[in-house]
Design a protein with these regions (language model features):
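Extended hydrophobic secondary-structure segments that form protein cores and membrane-embedded regions
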Residues: 25-26, 115-122, 150-155, 189-190
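Short, flexible loop/turn elements at secondary-structure junctions
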Residues: 29-33, 74-76, 122-124, 154-157
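Electropositive, glycine- and tryptophan-enriched low-complexity nucleic-acid-binding patches
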Residues: 52-119, 124
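RNase H-like two-metal-ion nuclease catalytic core shared by retroviral integrases
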Residues: 128, 150-172
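Two-metal-ion acidic nuclease core segments, chiefly of the RNase H-like superfamily
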Residues: 133-149
Length: 246
């Protein structure tokens, strides 16, 4: 486990790719947040005698529901994209957020790149063993023409994910003590998150409803152009673009 974490996440592979000017992103999904006038941990400065009022109990409100922020953090440029989902936290949602990062930020910064490194947890919406996860990066490869190298953190090491402390920890500080009254408020708070080192965040709502329980046919899995690493190939693999596919 230590070899995996120090050798891949913080050492040789990202450093090598960064030295070549290739993109390295760390992706993760923040916990779902209730949308509405609910108490939020922490505090903020308010005029004396005018505290923000919030109910003592939190229940999901019809028509508002929950928000699931999924982030892609560009390790080299200290900037990130966040898609705020309004449905299930699925593999399709994760891949959609990765595509949004590429379309909105990555393409302009890494035009002509031949490979992308994605560092992520081994569970949640991007599990290494998930059949639903891998067709997504394959479609991304076919469309972008890049190889996508995926490195999943092994169980018990999710705190090594850079998206957690570089991005989501800062977002939590930004909205502490603030009721997340609407999706617009959530997007505004996330997009205005910054740090003393110059973190830049862009954000948008993903309005698509993602369904759970979707099955991937064996034929679709067999069509994925994947090369697994000798060391824990279920965690480390490269997906390549297929010739002739858009």
């Amino acid at each position: 486990r230590l070899t995996k974490v120090t050798g891949v996440q913080t050492c040789a592979l990202p450093i090598c790719m960064l030295a070549q000017g290739l993109p390295v992103v760390s992706v993760d999904c923040k916990k779902k947040e209730l949308v509405g006038n609910f108490a939020n941990g922490g505090g903020e400065w308010r005029p004396r005698g005018a505290p923000t009022q919030a109910p003592g109990h939190d229940f999901e409100l019809p028509g508002l529901g929950k928000a699931a922020p999924y982030g892609a953090c560009d390790v080299a440029r200290n900037e990130a994209w966040v898609s705020v989902g309004v449905s299930a936290d699925t593999a399709q949602f994760a891949v959609s957020a990765l595509r949004a990062w590429w379309d909105q930020m990555g393409r302009a910064r890494y035009d002509g790149a031949s490979r992308l490194l994605v560092c992520c947890d081994g569970g949640g919406s991007n599990p290494g063993r998930s059949r639903l996860w891998k067709p997504g990066p394959q479609g991304f490869c076919d469309r972008s023409g890049m190889e996508v190298e995926v490195c999943h953190l092994p169980p018990g090491t999710s705190k090594w994910n850079k998206a957690g402390h570089r991005l989501f920890a800062q977002i939590s500080k930004r909205w502490r003590g603030r009721p997340l009254e609407s999706l617009e408020v959530i997007v505004s708070l996330i997009a205005s998150t910054t740090t003393s080192t110059g973190l830049e965040v862009r954000c948008a709502v993903d309005p698509v409803t993602y369904e759970r329980g979707i099955r991937v046919a064996d034929g679709e899995m067999d069509a994925i152009d994947i090369a697994r690493d000798e060391f824990h190939g279920e965690w480390n693999y490269v997906i390549r673009p297929r010739p002739g596919l858009p």
